[in-house]
Amino acid sequence: MTFLAIDVGNTRLKWALYDAPRAGAALRAHGVEFLDHIDRLAEGSWARLPPPGHMLGCVVAGDAVKRRVQEQMEIWDVTPSWVVASAQEAGLSNGYDHPSRLGADRWVAMIGARQHVLARGPARPLVLVMVGTAVTVECVDAQGRFIGGLILPGHGIMLRALESGTAGLHVPTGEVRLFPTNTSDALTSGGTYAIAGAVERMVQHVIAHCGTEPICLMTGGAGWKVAPSMTRPFELLENLIFDGLLEIAMRRLAAA
């Protein structure tokens, strides 16, 4: 039974078709579409896919976008299913004040990250950084409890805020430098170091709270830009949200 995983972010939709709804399943096809173009999926890349037997996704872009995606899925006889954060799922417990208000992408990515940690050896605390339109920093203890996290503006949001509120800052994208000597590099370095500083603060909080060094993971389209500026090594992982969706789907089907 093939499995379609869908991740609808703030700017893009990513999808992946696997040979089964289980962790470690073989990838058969995948793609990315900007949200402006998702109404073409049924006549484009999805038209060439074998009908999926099961589907699970997460969406942060809102109900209107979700409805557009579901309309494209009408070419198949498959029921759309979307993850909503809950108090507990797939071995992860949710410490948010109101669990259902935690972003589905954050919840699913943490589930994928937790399984990645457990596959490597004994359970350890985890710091997960997702770098996209926004940046999130998630902290999970060794028992699998999400203990809290941060939401920061991503690079693009930071730069647009500065450009709209400050005269003379419409400059090309710069490079990250130790000591920037031009405005482009100063803006890029400032945004990167702001993210790196927030991440390091949360790592220190986890060490103090859990009494041990966490495993540090990073994902998201812009992760490769930020990772080199971290104060400690971060492992870059490409498909944590898909990994989380596979884990959730496998467990839900087994319990059905």
Curated annotation (Swiss-Prot):
The active site is at D105 (proton acceptor). Substrate binds at Y96, G103, A104, D105, R106, T183. Its main location: cytoplasm. The keyword Transferase applies. One of its GO terms (cellular component) is cytoplasm. Its cofactor is NH4(+); K(+). This is Type III pantothenate kinase. It comes from Verminephrobacter eiseniae (strain EF01-2).
